[in-house]
């Protein structure tokens, strides 16, 4: 069956965002009087925000809200640390130029995702962008991939997903689409 849709995850797949996210979270944590070690963040990298906060033992809703807001505000100042997977982005661009459909499906917050895609000059390379708040369940649920496939009007068997994380790969597999694990040499 012909592949008609490419879907890529963002963090760790299309772009190595580890250092940019880590530095932004460090600043946000510091501004609320907390600290974040690189080892602690490494264990949580790729989790949805609420799961990250739960893992870090931060239960106060006001502190969580403040961290989320502060991180969103300072994240763009660390975009210089983003490392684009140029081979994958070039492949996606060629596929789209040839008439294929393309999408980003990420657990990242929509505003942060749009800002980062704009920064790397990739906003126009995707027909659809879905973020964490666009679905009820995070990965490993296939909801985000199933939603993209449905909105793009193709079948799962006509879709190829690029993912890096175990939960993302579980979601890709559960969607019924084809998938490829992406490993960036300097991800984390």
Language-model segments: residues:
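Asp-based, Mg2+/Mn2+-dependent phosphohydrolase catalytic module
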Residues: 1-4, 89, 93-96, 109-188
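Active-site neighborhood of HAD-like aspartate-dependent phosphohydrolases
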Residues: 1-42, 174-175
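Conserved phosphate-coupling serine/threonine residues in phosphotransfer and NTP-handling enzymes
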Residues: 13, 106-108
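Short beta->alpha linker loops
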Residues: 20, 44-48, 70, 83-87, ...
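Helix-loop "lid/cap" segments that line or gate small-molecule binding pockets
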Residues: 28, 48-61, 116, 148-149
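Helix N-cap/coil-helix junction residues
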Residues: 34-36, 58, 122, 153-154
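Residue-level detector of anion-binding/catalytic polar loops
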Residues: 35, 101, 178
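Metal-dependent phosphoesterase signature
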Residues: 54-93, 98-100
